[in-house]
Amino acid sequence: MMANETAAKSTKSSPTPAVEPESKLKILALHGYRQNGDGFKSKLGSFRKFIGKHAELVFVTAPHIAPPLPDSEAGTEPDPAQRSWWFNKDDGTFKGTNKNGPAIGFEDSLKLVEKVWKQEQCCGLLGFSQGACFVGLLCDLSARGMTSIKPEFAVLSSGFRSGSLVHLNCYETKVQIPSLHIYGEADEIIPKEMSMALADTFTDPQILTHPGGHFLPAQASQKQTYVEFFRERLQFHLEAQEIENATAANSILVDDSGPAGNGVHDDDDDDDDSD
């Protein structure tokens, strides 16, 4: 009898420990046209300090090298440090205000960010200029189940709607996740009206304006907005993780009870304990 009891106990798997919740948000950061991940990280030094208690940024570099500037000397080689997520002009360049053009290389960039998103286990998106345009597209694609990226929130600085023909149907339904939209009143590269139009594709967008031009501001006057936004996002993220862990723990208890409720289950069930 004692041997049978011992055998029964040995076949019962020990409860899988709950996964410790992440203490910070992990956010995929997408740079602008003719930028790269390292340069974008350098530019956001003050911003990263503001949000460092609540969030960590994961920087990725676009896969496409931008061509030399139009006023470059003949024979100038492309600068590998100047990157683009896609090109929306037939000459293989990009301009935010261009309409009804192609989206050359977009699918390659989509595959890249999907890979990094999964590897880094990110939960939010941040983008600047072309990167913010990309973030807007990713949010829409996610809502329609057309990408593996599932952002909980998004931050878009100097963003705009893509004018590429293949993207024109991406803004028919409003995105239902929390979003912070940042733009400069004096932005001459992406006029504020374009950023406002992108913000209008989100439900209840939070707007932060500044008197400057084409950059993501990180001054004392913006700090409170950033801190409060990311603190709230972290709170919701941790609460969701707690619910997920509790659900997983309850599932394990149900599995451990066995089909007859005697704490014994078949060998085939052991693999399920790791889910």
Curated annotation (Swiss-Prot):
Acidic residues bias spans: 266-275
EC number of this enzyme: 3.1.2.-
Biased composition (Polar residues): 7-16
Region of interest called Disordered, as start-end residue ranges on this chain: 1-21, 253-275
Origin: domain of life: Eukaryota
Listed GO MF terms: hydrolase activity
Residues at the active site: S129, D187, H214
Endpoints of the signal sequence: none
GO BP annotations, alphabetical order: response to retinoic acid
Record's keyword terms, sorted: Hydrolase
Keyword Nucleotidyltransferase: no
One term under GO cellular component: nucleus
Family to which this protein belongs: Belongs to the LovG family.
Protein name per UniProt: Esterase AAEL000016
Organism: Aedes aegypti
